[in-house]
């Protein structure tokens, strides 16, 4: 018999049998060795063949092991192992059986038949476990499905559906799929397309996260519940596993062979299987090498003839990019568009999924949490889709709470640390013999006793609460299993079992759960097991940086005192500070228009009066950092072509992938202060872009993504009309001054731009009385730098006034003050520090001598 006539699987098993015999120190390869390796073979035919006729494969394997142990062992055979006469006889009989069946190659299942026909140990074991020639012959025919073994890889293609697909209907029967709520219209349209005679292949198209895969799972659940038309009853929904299909396909044509095996198996099922291909676009080009055919082209004939019932799912972008380009493939599919559900629909979906997440995280999810997850995610997470983003919020909030429940509560942790600290001190004091130490030791022992008692009481309480939570968890799991059993009994028509579960088991478990939940809600002092809207808001704030959580009292006070906080850094300019403060308060109180930025302001006024400083102060107030603002110098956008830098280059231009300067900054930090400095210096086309931002709080970047500006404060600064402010200051009141300046502004900016700004604020020029306060603020920064080097500096009032006088210039505002500080204070200080006249550690006073500021120690 020629070994090249064996199938690949049979050849591999023979090689394994040889190493098996070698490992057991047997001189010959016996039929038992070969049967043992065939039984252990991954993806082999023997195990499923024996299982199909009711033979326990584990018991059979044990019998073979015992027979192997009884074989004679020969030490030092040096790797020369030969097939025994018995094995050669068995293989010759396999060859005979293959020729009889009309096969070109000998497959491994014929070896079982040959073993039963021959006499020997293997034949006896097979008969002992219940194998007969008739049973095996029938099982082989069933396994082959009337096909001949015409190539060496024939065994690999068998059971292709089992290997390369996941049975969704089976998972639905076992209750492993999440419930599908709503989506009736899409499921109905999918069923309608599946009912067609030809081209009965729907493709679900929608944005990522809208629930395309869930629709197919919903279809599987409807099929097992019998809630489908006659044509779809008792059908199976199988999901194609592209990873398994491609994995390990090393040689050219191996992938195609596997896919062909799947298609052949599907053809044999005669329309009883609906194949679901998730990420359908991966089929286009899958397995394509030079000149080879890709998976998409192999599917086309089966799809066109209606032999293959297929449901695809892909996103809009990928459908356009891959499927639409292949018109022949596109026409074989019928599009079913899956839109994003509304907030109300999302709330219904979340209510349906609630129990699954409660069971997984061992927490209770309240209804306000569900409503908050849907509404807040819809408002604040703009780059993802419902219901996916809302489900993620619930999931993460549950995980966060579970993590807190599993770790030690903070109060207990604090007590434990204190006990350890006291014990360490106790050990140290025991070594001392003086009276003070003894007295301290007595006090310490008393405190330690109290703390240890407190700790043990608290620990008991914690353990009791944890046990109560675990109790409800077990009941919930039992209830879930009872409901799955009820569904299975209903489908199989077992009325006795149904009534037993429905009227006996479930009401009892529900009573237990109600009692346990009541007991749980009474005492919970250390553990929180409820996901509320506060937890959802907290998770969202962590994701986006947008403060949507309920305001703490401290934050409310801070917002009410916002003007005083800003005035610590910005001197004068009451109108500007009030306008900004009111906008932020409106936003945090939830009264601002949700479809516009928090506030948009145009700051007008001469240079050096605090326009940019107010923006920095606002960023510091909101985010505790001056750098937490997006600052764009509009003088960089003077040319028409520079405008594209804000939103990103259009397709085909260099830098298209990088995104825009403004849009990328806001995508990363949706809650920020945007400062457009010196806005009048920008090209007029920039204002066309800003119109959308100011009116709708949105902007589309170069790649077509919508960027959300609804949680930003947009501030533009300009020097327009500053000469008029300088001239008329003092002679006109604020409103008259503002009218004159706005007249100049309206000549430079278009009316539609000015009309969209919340408020234009005119800054006053700074007077002498303001300069002393500004000088003090700027000196504080210098003191901080000196403090790091060990110098404590103070300034007298007289010196401060001289400094303010030196830095006063009505035209340039507060900027000359910086130069005055450098010349009058920093330069002399630097010289004295370097020469050693000022020593660290001693206080330094800045005073006046001969009309000059001097540093003394």
Curated annotation (Swiss-Prot):
Binding positions for ATP 2 per the UniProt entry: 605-612
Ranges for region Repeat 2: 83-146
Keyword Cell wall biogenesis/degradation found: no
GO function term, MF aspect, one: ATP binding
Domain Clp R: 3-146
Keywords, sorted A to Z: ATP-binding, Chaperone, Coiled coil, Cytoplasm, Nucleotide-binding, Repeat, Stress response
PROSITE patterns: CLP_R, CLPAB_1, CLPAB_2
Region NBD2, residue ranges: 555-765
Region annotated Linker, chain positions: 341-545
CDD domains, per database record: AAA, RecA-like_ClpB_Hsp104-like
NBD1, as annotated region: 159-340
Any one Gene Ontology BP term: protein refolding
Job description of the protein: Part of a stress-induced multi-chaperone system, it is involved in the recovery of the cell from heat-induced damage, in cooperation with DnaK, DnaJ and GrpE. Acts before DnaK, in the processing of protein aggregates. Protein binding stimulates the ATPase activity; ATP hydrolysis unfolds the denatured protein aggregates, which probably helps expose new hydrophobic binding sites on the surface of ClpB-bound aggregates, contributing to the solubilization and refolding of denatured protein aggregates by DnaK.
The name this protein goes by in its record: Chaperone protein ClpB
Organism, as annotated: Photorhabdus laumondii subsp. laumondii (strain DSM 15139 / CIP 105565 / TT01) (Photorhabdus luminescens subsp. laumondii)
Gene that encodes the chain: clpB
């Amino acid at each position: 018999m020629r070994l090249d006539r064996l199938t690949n699987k049979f050849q591999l098993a023979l090689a394994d049998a040889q190493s098996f015999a070698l490992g057991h120190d047997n001189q010959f390869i016996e039929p038992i060795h070969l049967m043992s390796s065939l039984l252990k073979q991954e993806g082999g035919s023997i195990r499923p063949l024996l299982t199909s006729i009711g033979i326990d494969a584990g018991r059979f394997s044990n019998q073979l092991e015992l027979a192997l142990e009884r074989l004679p062992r020969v030490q030092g055979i040096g790797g020369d192992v030969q097939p025994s006469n018995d094995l050669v006889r068995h293989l010759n009989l396999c060859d005979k059986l293959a020729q009889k069946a009309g096969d070109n190659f000998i497959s491994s299942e014929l070896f079982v038949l040959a073993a039963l026909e021959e006499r020997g140990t293997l034949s006896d074991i097979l008969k002992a476990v219940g194998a007969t020639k008739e049973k095996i012959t029938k099982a082989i025919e069933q396994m082959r499905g009337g096909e001949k073994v015409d190539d060496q890889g024939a065994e690999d293609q068998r059971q292709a559906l089992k290997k390369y697909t996941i049975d969704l209907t089976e998972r639905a029967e076992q209750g492993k799929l999440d419930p599908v709520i709503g989506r009736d219209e899409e499921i109905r349209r999918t069923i309608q397309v599946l009912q067609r005679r030809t081209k009965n292949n729907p493709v679900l198209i929608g944005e990522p996260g809208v629930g395309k895969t869930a629709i197919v799972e919903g279809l599987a659940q409807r099929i097992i519940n019998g809630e489908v038309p006659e044509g779809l009853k008792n059908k199976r929904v199988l999901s194609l596993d592209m990873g398994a299909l491609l994995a390990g396909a090393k040689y050219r044509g191996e992938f195609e062979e596997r896919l062909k095996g799947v298609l052949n198996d599907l053809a044999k099922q005669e329309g009883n299987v609906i194949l679901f291909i998730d990420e359908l676009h991966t089929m286009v080009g899958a397995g394509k090498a030079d000149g080879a055919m890709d998976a998409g082209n192999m599917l086309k004939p089966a799809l066109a003839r209606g032999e293959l019932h297929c449901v695809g799912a892909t996103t809009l972008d990928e459908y356009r990019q891959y499927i639409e380009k292949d018109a022949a493939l596109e026409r074989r599919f019928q599009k079913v568009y899956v839109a994003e559900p509304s907030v109300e629909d999302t709330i219904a979906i979340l209510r349906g999924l609630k129990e699954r997440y409660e069971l997984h995280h061992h927490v209770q999810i309240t209804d306000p949490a569900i409503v908050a997850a849907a509404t807040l995610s819809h408002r604040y997470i703009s780059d993802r889709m419902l219901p996916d983003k809302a489900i993620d919020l619930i999931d993460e909030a549950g995980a966060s709470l579970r993590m807190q429940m599993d770790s030690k509560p903070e109060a207990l942790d604090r007590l434990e640390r204190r006990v350890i600290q006291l014990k360490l001190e106790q050990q140290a004091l025991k070594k001392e013999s003086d009276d003070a130490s003894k007295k301290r030791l007595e006090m310490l022992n008393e405190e330690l006793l109290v703390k240890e008692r407190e700790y043990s009481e608290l620990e008991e309480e914690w353990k009791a609460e944890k046990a109560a939570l675990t109790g409800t968890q077990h009941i919930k799991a039992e209830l879930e299993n009872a409901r799955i059993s009820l569904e299975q009994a209903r489908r199989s028509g077992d009325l006795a079992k149904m009534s037993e579960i429905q009227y006996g088991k479930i009401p009892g478990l529900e009573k237990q759960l109600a009692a346990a939940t009541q007991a749980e809600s009474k005492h919970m002092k250390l553990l929180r097991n409820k996901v509320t809207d506060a937890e959802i808001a907290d998770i969202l704030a962590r994701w986006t940086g947008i403060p949507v959580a309920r305001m703490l009292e401290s934050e409310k006070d801070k917002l009410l005192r916002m003007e005083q906080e800003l005035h610590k850094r910005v001197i004068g300019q009451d109108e500007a500070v009030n306008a900004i403060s009111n906008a932020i308060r409106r936003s945090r109180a939830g009264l601002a228009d949700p479809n516009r930025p928090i506030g948009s302001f145009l700051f007008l006024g001469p240079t050096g009066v605090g326009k940019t400083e107010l923006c920095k102060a606002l960023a510091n107030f909101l985010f505790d950092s001056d750098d937490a603002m997006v600052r764009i110098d509009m003088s960089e956008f003077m040319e028409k072509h520079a405008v594209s830098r804000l939103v990103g280059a259009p397709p085909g231009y260099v830098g298209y992938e990088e995104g825009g300067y403004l849009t990328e900054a806001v995508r990363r930090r949706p809650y920020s202060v945007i400062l457009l400095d010196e806005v009048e210096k920008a090209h007029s086309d920039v204002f066309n872009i800003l119109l959308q931002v100011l009116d709708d709080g949105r902007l589309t970047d170069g790649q077509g993504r919508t960027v959300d500006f609804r949680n930003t404060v947009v501030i533009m600064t300009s020097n327009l009309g500053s000469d008029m402010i300088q001239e008329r200051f003092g002679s006109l009141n604020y409103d008259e001054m503002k009218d004159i300046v706005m007249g100049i502004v309206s000549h430079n900016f278009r009316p539609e731009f000015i009309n969209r700004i919340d408020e234009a604020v005119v800054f006053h020029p700074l007077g002498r009385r303001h300069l002393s306060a500004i000088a003090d603020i700027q000196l504080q920064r210098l003191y901080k730098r000196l403090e790091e080097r060990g110098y404590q500096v103070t300034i007298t009032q007289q010196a401060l006034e001289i400094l303010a006088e030196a830095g006063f210039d009505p035209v340039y505002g507060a900027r000359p003050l910086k130069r005055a500080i450098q010349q009058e204070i920093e330069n002399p200080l630097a010289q004295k520090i370097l020469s050693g006249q000022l020593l660290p550690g001693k206080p330094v006073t800045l005073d006046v001598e001969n009309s000059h500021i001097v540093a003394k120690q």
